[in-house]
């Protein structure tokens, strides 16, 4: 009986050690650089009329599934670049959403993630363009000062960046003291 307890305890310790090792390998460990505390100061500023999401965006099933409120309450316009508008929207269960609206193309899209993603990366979208390049837009936490791809650097403004004509498969976001790489996939 005593031998079984010892074996069980050893097996339990081995399982815990294996789980810890796998979580570090799969989820990342100390190699994940943190920039800032994950806060988004753009969401704390006073709301104005331009911060309201278009009705067409609120009508999407995506909005009902992901936004914290059905009318997108708390949304903030982060960037306006030509006909492209980027919004941050509080999401359900601690999520935060990035919404991209292109008035000229008549399109809108969105991505949501847990706010903790902003500690080690970005909530982003990488849209394929007609020329094969990507339009990469992202929402980052406070502390990020730039986004870069292929030796082209753009400033982060109001917690957002816009990188046009990205041909590679990664984008770098950073601050004067730290850098993070975002893999865009295929």
PLM ranges: what are they?
Residues 107-112, 158-160:
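A short, polar/proline- and glycine-enriched secondary-structure boundary/capping micro-motif
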Residues 79-80, 89-90, 140, 156, ...:
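Generic beta-strand structural signal
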Residues 25-104, 181, 186:
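Extracytoplasmic low-complexity, Pro/Thr/Ser/Ala/Gly-rich segments
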Residues 145-186:
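Ser/Thr-rich low-complexity repeats and stalk/linker segments
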